[in-house]
Amino acid sequence: MPIGFWSVILGAMCVISCGEKQKRSFNAFDTYLQFYQEVNDSLSKNPRYVCAEAQKRMTATTDSTTYYHYVMLLAKAYMFRSDMDSAAVCMNQADAYCHRNAPTPQISDLYADIYNMRGNVLARQALVDSAVICFSKALTYRLNGDRKEV
């Protein structure tokens, strides 16, 4: 067989294998988004269920950023359970992850979720001025992220 034929085959295999890595990462986050849409209404009605399901899915994901989106979903469920200490721990874990990573649109989206949650917690504590500052930061991060529609 000619060398050109094998070069084409090898090149095609490289392109396919690189494409799958991107697809796997996308699928992990896509799975999170689908789960989030399914349980969004349950957050206020049945936060214990959301906590249990989010914890199960956290252990199954292989993408770090997706893992911390699950952590933030867990924080929301804790907030609805009025477990503000656990919510704060989750927010701090996600914040530490963001600080360790280079700024990207995905990290900006995660920061937006963190500051939005902090704003919600502060608003529940009647700390309105501090909540407004957090909501403003959340908006700034959201505009730098991929998920502007959220």
Where are the model-predicted features located?
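Positively charged n-region of N-terminal signal peptides that target proteins for export
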Residues: 1-5
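Bacterial N-terminal signal peptides
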Residues: 6-14
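A "functional boundary" signal
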Residues: 18-150
